[in-house]
UniProtKB/Swiss-Prot annotation:
Main location: membrane
InterPro entries in the cross-refs: RGS7BP/RGS9BP
Segments forming a coiled coil: 53-94, 158-187
UniProt organism field: Xenopus laevis (African clawed frog)
Domain of life assignment: Eukaryota
Protein localization: Membrane
Function: Regulator of G protein-coupled receptor (GPCR) signaling. Probably acts by regulating the activity of some 'R7' family protein (RGS6, RGS7, RGS9 and/or RGS11).
Transmembrane stretches, start-end: 231-250
An individual GO BP term: G protein-coupled receptor signaling pathway
UniProt keyword Transmembrane, yes or no: yes
Protein name from the UniProt record: Regulator of G-protein signaling 9-binding protein C
Family: Belongs to the RGS7BP/RGS9BP family.
Cytoplasmic side: 1-230
Annotated Gene Ontology cellular component terms: membrane; neuron projection
Amino acid sequence: MPLQNVKVADEGTVNFQKVKEECITAVESLHKVVACYRHLVLTIGGSSDSIHLRDELRRTRERAQELAVCNRNKLTTALRDKKLSKKDCEELERLWVEFSSCLELFHNDMCKVYELATALPHSSTNQPAIQTGSTGNTSAIASRALNVQNINYSDSPANKASLEYQEIEEEILKVDNMITDMEMKVNVLRWTVEANTRMNDELKSTHDSSSVVLLSEEESNSKGCCSDGQLIVSLLLCGTALVAITLYSIL
């Protein structure tokens, strides 16, 4: 093979590895932000609900949307490259499935936030909707989501409920359109994408480890039973010997 062709192939491999690492980092960042958003959703209507929580939800939601756009652009460009090998294409398709699944979960959580915010509007007095006697701070959770990359946000919370509902509706529509646009640009059939590890192997390893634990427990239990049985036999022999000695002394 000519030296020039080898050099071009090496450059193509390096470029793909760089693109793949960027896509993996972007997908992992989106996973973290969506997980933090889901955790914040659970506190709506509880004792930790406040204006600051609603603002944290809004900022985390905006951060997740920015990461989603970044993910979509990177993966779409990479998957539409006709020079990809079959192996490289399979790796990107797995990342695509992870990204699209995470985006669907985020869309469901946004719809849940809209329904909960409509059913449990926050009062102007900043009082919790449910008085449980326990309180908690959610700023640490939101900070983990917002610190994935440095972005400046306004610290002023949204004061009008109607404006908040309108913003959530618009953001839900954006994510919905993004999912539709992704399916039209890149046709990746999820049921054709294979995982890195086989589920049977994972189940087998889990079954083997559980079997070892059960066997060790059974052995310990059997040893305990043997010890108890030996003790009972010893007591019976001692009692028989004492009775025999007593009868012999009487006779």
